């Protein structure tokens, strides 16, 4: 975003995908199975059901749809999924056979993975947003901060089998689920304390824990499936993974829109819309800081107006960041303010 347009966020996937396809052709063995007729009817029912339900989740915040239209989308999605269940019942050529759910570990693993990935799917989206808006990182540096998370995730792939064989699925899943919560809280704490040099190590640890959790969950989900259902079960698992992560990003966007529209008070006595969540979090974290701001201290935000790039749908006025020095430590207070609240003094 600093050096090119936003389109390159997606275009960069093209060469990566080509390299991945070539590597697959060169390295992966070509296993063959008996082919069967493609279940076009089941595919269309599933595609329609998941697409309209995901669109309905975005709601009026992202799409501008009326409540009646959203209710209609939900109804269409539910009907499409129910029709697929009726279609797949006693149908040996169904896209995803209902016989898959007779395997208890598959059903439990699929449900647990779906719920778990809704939360974990928010992390790759919310972490850069927090680094940029909450801590004032540039888009480039926020992107660099994600590299330790990827390295931690990739590094655990080599040893996760040994970890699961030694401790067992139950202990690994319980420990990694609790560990992911603790690491996420550790990330917030270190960020609010201003220990930015610790953040790469915390993100590396987060990648390790997350990778161990879902690698063990995926193998538990598929390990008891019979050979004739293994391919279908793996495809259904991949579909549920993508759907749950999409839902996670959608929910994260809804939460950002909800809390971003909250109001804060300025010294004029009026209430103006603004996004000042980091300031609130800073106040709430005062018992854990080595030094804190004086009670009820007023910090006057210095603003620097700028307009977004030409061609944007709406011109947006915003405030850049002001660095306040307290007891020799640099404390960041970040507010994304609109034209109504600029120049105000925020109390917290």
Swiss-Prot record:
- GO CC terms, sorted: plasma membrane
Keywords of this entry: Cell inner membrane, Cell membrane, Membrane, Transmembrane, Transmembrane helix, Transport
Q: Where in the cell is it found?
A: Cell inner membrane
The primary site where this protein sits is: membrane
Which Gene3D superfamilies does this chain map to?
A: MFS general substrate transporter like domains
Any keyword Transmembrane? yes
**Transmembrane regions:** 8-28, 40-60, 68-88, 106-126, 129-149, 185-205, 239-259
Topology within the bilayer? Multi-pass membrane protein
One MF annotation (Gene Ontology) recorded for this entry? transmembrane transporter activity
A Pfam family the protein falls into: MFS_1
The question of whether Transmembrane is a record keyword is answered with yes
- Give the UniProt family note: Belongs to the major facilitator superfamily. TCR/Tet family.
PANTHER family, alphabetized: BLR6921 PROTEIN, MAJOR FACILITATOR SUPERFAMILY MULTIDRUG TRANSPORTER MFSC
From the Swiss-Prot or TrEMBL record, give the protein name. Putative multidrug resistance protein MdtD
Which gene is annotated as encoding this protein in its UniProt record?
A: mdtD
């Amino acid at each position: 975003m600093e050096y090119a347009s936003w389109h390159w966020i997606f275009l960069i996937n093209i060469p990566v995908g080509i390299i991945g396809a070539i590597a697959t052709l060169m390295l992966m063995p070509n296993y063959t199975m008996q082919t069967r007729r493609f279940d076009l009817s089941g595919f269309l029912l599933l595609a329609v059901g998941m697409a309209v339900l995901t669109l309905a989740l975005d709601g009026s915040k992202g799409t501008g749809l009326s409540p009646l239209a959203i209710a209609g989308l939900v109804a269409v999605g539910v009907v499409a999924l129910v029709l697929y269940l009726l279609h797949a019942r006693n149908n040996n050529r169904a896209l995803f056979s209902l016989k898959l759910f007779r395997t208890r570990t598959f059903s439990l693993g699929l449900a647990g993975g779906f719920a778990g990935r809704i939360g974990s799917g928010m992390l790759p989206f919310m972490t850069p947003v927090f680094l940029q808006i909450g801590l004032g990182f540039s888009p480039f540096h926020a992107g660099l901060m994600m590299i330790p998370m990827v390295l931690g995730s990739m590094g655990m792939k080599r040893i996760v089998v040994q970890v699961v064989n030694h401790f067992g699925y139950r202990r690994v899943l319980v420990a990694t689920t609790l560990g992911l919560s603790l690491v996420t809280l550790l990330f917030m704490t270190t960020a609010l304390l201003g220990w930015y040099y610790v953040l790469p190590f915390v993100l590396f640890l987060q990648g390790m824990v997350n990778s161990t959790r879902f690698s063990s969950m995926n193998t538990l989900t598929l390990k008891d499936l019979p050979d004739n259902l293994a391919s279908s079960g793996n495809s259904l698992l991949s579909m549920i993974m993508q759907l749950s992560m999409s839902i996670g990003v959608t929910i994260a966007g809804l939460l950002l829109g909800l809390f971003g529209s909250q109001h804060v008070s300025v010294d004029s006595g009026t209430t103006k819309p603004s996004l000042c969540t980091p300031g609130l979090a800073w106040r709430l974290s005062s018992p854990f800081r080595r030094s804190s701001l004086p009670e009820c201290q007023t910090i006057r935000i210095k603003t620097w107006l700028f307009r977004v790039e030409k061609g944007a749908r709406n011109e947006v006025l915003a405030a850049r960041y002001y660095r306040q020095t307290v007891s020799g430590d640099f404390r960041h207070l970040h507010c994304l303010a609109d034209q109504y609240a600029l120049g105000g003094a925020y109390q917290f």
